[in-house]
Amino acid sequence: MNIAAVFNALLVSVLATVLWKYIKLREHAFMVEEELVLMRQSQELSQVQIDYHAALQTLLEDGTRMVCTGRMHTDRICRFESLCYSTEAEEFIYFHSNSSVMLPNLGSRRFQPALLDLSSVEDHNTQYFNFVELPAAALKFMPKPVFVPDVALIANRFNPDNLMHVFHDDLLPIYYTMQQFTDLDPETRLFFMEGWSEGVHFDLYKLLSNKQPLLREQLKTLGRLLCFTKSYVGLSKITTWYQYGFVQPQGPKANILVSGNEIRQFTKFMMQKLNVSLEESSSEEYIVVFSRTINRLILNEAELILALAQEFQMKTITVSLEEHSFSDIVRLISNASMLVSMHGAQLVMSLFLPRGATVVELFPYAINPEHYTPYKTLATLPGMDLQYIAWQNTAREDTVTYPDRPWDQGGIAHLDKAEQERIIKSTEVPRHLCCRNPEWLFRAYQDTKVDIPSLIHVIRQTVKSKPGPKKKWSGSLYPGKVRDARCQASVQGTSEARLSVSWQVPWNLKYLKVREVKYEVWIQEQGENTYMPYILSHQNHTFSENIKPFTIYLVWIRCIFNKNLLGPFADVLLCST
């Protein structure tokens, strides 16, 4: 064999080995560099350090893990580990591995209609959340993930340009969702996935966390595939008190679960974040008139302010969202004796009023106050301790309408002439569904000259003296069960019997200041469907009416504080005559 050929073959083999090692080293260096870039992207999200290789290995081996609370999509909140999001497909991804957990495991029921609601507005088809499923092995063929090391709360804002929606649908539910799960502390990062821009009230969302909230559009700048190491998806609806009329005309929710106490805990938190202190405020009592500057105007606002000041002998000031900072408005409202405003989103600020203050809501012509009650419902929540008054303009001549404006500002020029005539002549907007009823919009955006004597008369029916806040909490505490309930029967002949029942007061009564204590007793003959109810003032009573000899009776007893605070029934007594 030619020695030169052997030498060349060896040289080629050595060069190939060196070249292969160089390529492998370069690939490894490229992968390390890519991991460093992805790690830096992850750390741009947070100061939390992350071991990128370990995080990627965990995702490949363990996949996604999900455990949810709630039985239905309308009350479900889910906790995820390693939930991912494709910014290109704009969809969440659940990666399956042998270690994945999915509870509840709904199968195709997950699409009927969704796993959960992303917002606190119940069962709205623009607010549904779901994910796409992939095997964890698919990660090898996908863009390298950027890991989000912060604990994430993922939700939708419903309408961030409207202050009522901001507080009712977003801020309160986010605040109490974070109270519900200990992982959701002030270092949680909020991710809003509905697609809106920041909006005029975005600074309020920033108060809920020490970290800047991120919007869906911003996620595209972070990477093509984001993976949340730990996240919670969905919002608690427990603080919401109003439904907006998507299925039936708007009104209070059927089962309201929030009280004024929880609202006031939230407002206390917000005031602290806004650096608003009641101690900084003047002790002088005053009335606040909320001024609107674009639509739904009070045409004789100056006259109204003067009349209120004279009637109640109190300083009267105006505030507006356009001319005052939010913290200044909160500072003024939080110490006011009365808040007067046209119907509108700004009235949600009444949740900052002190206990004992008065809310006066003004309604334009043809708008029935009983049909639009978000602020009445708020003011009358148990424990809010606010007085609510509604006034409606009933004089057609005191209203200014704008039929030629665009439809979304109350214009009706796009409607046929007959419909325009009907709306103009109508004296009351019929109950309707949300959100584009032209008659409602026409009346909602009209301006009003307030009949001041009429308004003062309506206020005076509720506010008999000078209005003023009360600082002390007058909580509604419920009685416990009555104790040691006993019964004793006596029979007189074959046709008459008596049933003597006695009990001890609930043990918590001795710690409470209660104006009035009553007891409710139900007596039911065994086997019958009806019962005889009694309201009693004492802890014992002998019953003879409708009591029969040689009969078994079931007796229930409960305590009532102040006429309407009903305690639980004690265990049923079985009494034989």
From Swiss-Prot:
The Enzyme Commission number assigned here is 2.4.1.312
**Gene3D superfamilies assigned:** Immunoglobulins
Which keywords does the record carry? Endoplasmic reticulum, Glycoprotein, Glycosyltransferase, Membrane, Signal-anchor, Transferase, Transmembrane, Transmembrane helix
Q: List GO BP terms, alphabetically.
A: neuron migration; protein O-linked glycosylation; protein O-linked mannosylation
Give ranges for the Cytoplasmic compartment: 1-4
Spell out where the chain is glycosylated.
98, 275, 335, 540
Membrane topology is: Single-pass type II membrane protein
Q: Which reaction does it catalyse?
A: 3-O-(alpha-D-mannosyl)-L-threonyl-[protein] + UDP-N-acetyl-alpha-D-glucosamine = 3-O-(N-acetyl-beta-D-glucosaminyl-(1->4)-alpha-D-mannosyl)-L-threonyl-[protein] + UDP + H(+)
Organism superkingdom: Eukaryota
| Gene Ontology molecular function, alphabetical | acetylglucosaminyltransferase activity; protein O-acetylglucosaminyltransferase activity
- Cellular localization per UniProt: Endoplasmic reticulum membrane
Residue intervals on the Lumenal side: 26-577
Of the GO CC terms on this record, one is:
endoplasmic reticulum membrane
Q: Copy the pathway line from the protein's UniProt record.
A: Protein modification; protein glycosylation
> Which family does the UniProt entry place this protein in?
Belongs to the glycosyltransferase 61 family.
Q: Could you identify this protein by its name?
A: Protein O-linked-mannose beta-1,4-N-acetylglucosaminyltransferase 2
